[in-house]
Amino acid sequence: MSKIAVVYWSGTGNTEAMANEVAEGAKAAGAEVDVLTASEFGEDKMDAYDAVAFGCPAMGAEELEDSEFEPMFSDCEGKLGGKKIALFGSYGWGDGEWMRTWEETCKADGAVLACDSVLANEAPDDDAVAACKALGAALA
């Protein structure tokens, strides 16, 4: 059984809702899952998991949230080489540039993206919920 961490930061609850759907998808596929906020996770926990789903909404000028999530993620970057990961997040404006930039960073760090990233415009709709569950299953 694989062990998955679903790590997220959420300001309005949209990315948190996505995180819970990712966890459900991974559990349904047989994985053991821990759902953690960015402040509960760090580089020291990376080795305890077979795969990690990272979730963060677009903030400011299409950037990762910079007070909790981005510092935690930066600390984890050294452990991304060969690690199976997936990315998800919500946004209220723009076209997903923050996600494309984030994916490129992860690839440069040597991470293995298990599936396409999932984006939701504001609250996740039925399609985004299904995509989040599929993302979780892809990590399991």
Role assignments for model-derived ranges:
Residues 2-4, 14-17, 21-38, 42-44, ...:
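FMN-binding flavodoxin-like domain, especially the glycine-rich phosphate-binding loop
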Residues 8-12:
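Aromatic-flanked redox-active Cys/Sec active sites in thiol-based oxidoreductases
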